[in-house]
């Protein structure tokens, strides 16, 4: 029986890549800088002391970081027994965004350039805005700028509630984000607006990767909170991913937990399970692992590392999240059967000590564990697509165009 379980710790980079200079990210190191802050006692909010990740360390995380950067992260045990196979992987794709990272993991790197809205003020073309106002019958719009999602709610949330004007904003990523109040504006109405925006961006040739619905609740600045009803409308991958091949060629099953289905525009996904927060995502993953049959992938994205702690530059929160993940990891490992493989990885970096609020161009960890997986180093991987090629070989699908099987 062939089953693979892929866990993406969204944004969990392990050191800047060779091309980081192109992105302004030389020296970025999500894991290394979190560990350093913990070791110095600078991340003692809601947790305390050196970064404590014994289970990830046993799977080779510290060694993978050493391969990427040349050193073991502060406070982590470089001499611990390693029971898994580990690697550090470079991104072939042109960007450092979520779709690029995930698609490349599934064997389809993004070799074209995404479109971006690079102006920090008046970010969107007037023609696009006019079409959205007309088609969605809007009273206007707010924002039209680059912003952090939580900051813009404090700035414009109250005005949005009074006027009914949606908040449009973007970032350094290829995204068009729309924030609206779940109750005063309405969740269905927000989703409909995002569908219209997706159509207009596609028809207009803007080449924007995602439209993201950002619903929130609350009644005044300071207590607005984004909810778990985020929805991403992505373009489809430019070629069949290993997920699609498993479904088409092997009549397999691919279970999305969290936002995976959105990232792949539902391509190659046979079941979607929604969950919000680390514990809920873990619980849903465990349930699906227990029910998984032959030729099945259970694919989970743990988004909180990125959205709650990476972008918000919350070192202590990120550290606490990693420690929670590590504590629960044995629950996943104990469910593995003889031929199963568990892959822990990431899609990009988002160093919470870095300037700004954007992603960072970093190597990702590739930690592979299973009863029949030989422990030890799998070395430096030139593309995340090595994961996809490894899965293609494992399940016996046709080869992916990119990547080399790791074993």
UniProtKB/Swiss-Prot annotation:
Protein's pathway: Carbohydrate degradation; 2-deoxy-D-ribose 1-phosphate degradation; D-glyceraldehyde 3-phosphate and acetaldehyde from 2-deoxy-alpha-D-ribose 1-phosphate: step 1/2
Molecular function per GO: magnesium ion binding; manganese ion binding; phosphopentomutase activity
Biological processes annotated in GO: 2-deoxyribose 1-phosphate catabolic process; 5-phosphoribose 1-diphosphate biosynthetic process; metabolic compound salvage; nucleotide metabolic process
Gene Ontology annotations for the cellular component aspect, listed alphabetically: cytosol
Superkingdom, taxonomy of origin: Bacteria
InterPro entries: Alkaline_phosphatase_core_sf, DeoB, Metalloenzyme, Phosphopentomutase_DeoB_cap_sf
Main location: cytoplasm
Keywords assigned: Cytoplasm, Isomerase, Manganese, Metal-binding
Job of this protein: Isomerase that catalyzes the conversion of deoxy-ribose 1-phosphate (dRib-1-P) and ribose 1-phosphate (Rib-1-P) to deoxy-ribose 5-phosphate (dRib-5-P) and ribose 5-phosphate (Rib-5-P), respectively.
Family: Belongs to the phosphopentomutase family.
Positions annotated to bind Mn(2+) 2: 306, 311, 359
Cofactor note (record): Binds 2 manganese ions.
Protein name, entry field: Phosphopentomutase
Disulfide bonds: none
Binding-site residues, Mn(2+) 1: 10, 347-348
EC numbers for this chain: 5.4.2.7
Keyword Membrane part of the UniProt annotation: no
Enzyme class: isomerase
């Amino acid at each position: 029986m062939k089953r693979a379980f892929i866990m993406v710790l969204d944004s969990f980079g392990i050191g800047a890549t060779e091309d980081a200079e192109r992105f302004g990210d030389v020296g970025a190191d999500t894991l290394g800088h979190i560990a350093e802050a913990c070791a110095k006692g600078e991340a003692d909010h809601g947790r305390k002391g050196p970064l404590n990740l014994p289970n990830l360390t046993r799977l080779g995380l510290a060694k993978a970081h050493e391969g990427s950067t040349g050193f073991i992260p502060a406070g982590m045990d470089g001499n611990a027994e390693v029971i898994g196979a580990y690697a550090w992987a470079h991104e072939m794709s042109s960007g450092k965004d979520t779709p690029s990272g995930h698609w490349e993991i599934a064997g389809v790197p993004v070799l074209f350039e995404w479109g971006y809205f690079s102006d920090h003020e008046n970010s969107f073309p007037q023609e696009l805005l006019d079409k959205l106002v007309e088609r969605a019958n809007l009273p206007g719009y707010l924002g039209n700028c680059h912003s952090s999602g939580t900051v813009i709610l404090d700035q414009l949330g109250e005005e949005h509630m009074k006027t009914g004007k949606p908040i449009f904003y973007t970032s350094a990523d290829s995204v068009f984000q729309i924030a609206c109040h779940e109750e005063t504006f309405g969740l269905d109405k927000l989703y409909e607006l995002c569908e219209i925006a997706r159509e207009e961006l596609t028809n207009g040739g803007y080449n924007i990767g995602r439209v993201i619905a950002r619903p929130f609740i609350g009644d005044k600045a300071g207590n607005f909170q984004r909810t778990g009803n985020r929805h991403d409308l992505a373009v489809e991958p430019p070629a069949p991913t290993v997920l699609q091949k498993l479904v088409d060629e092997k009549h397999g099953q691919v279970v999305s937990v969290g936002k995976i289905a959105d990232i792949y525009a539902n391509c190659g996904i046979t079941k979607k399970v929604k969950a919000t927060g680390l514990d809920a995502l873990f619980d849903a993953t465990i349930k699906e692992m227990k029910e998984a049959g032959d030729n099945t992938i259970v694919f989970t994205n743990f988004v909180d590392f990125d959205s709650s702690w990476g972008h918000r530059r919350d070192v202590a929160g990120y550290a606490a999240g990693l420690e929670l993940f590590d504590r629960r990891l044995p629950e996943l490992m104990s469910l593995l059967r003889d031929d199963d493989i568990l892959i822990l990885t990431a899609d990009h970096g988002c160093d919470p000590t870095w300037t700004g609020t954007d992603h960072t161009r970093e190597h990702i960890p590739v930690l592979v564990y299973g009863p029949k997986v030989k422990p030890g180093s799998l070395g430096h991987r030139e593309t995340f697509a090595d994961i996809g090629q490894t899965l293609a070989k494992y399940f016996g699908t046709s080869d992916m165009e990119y990547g080399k099987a790791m074993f």
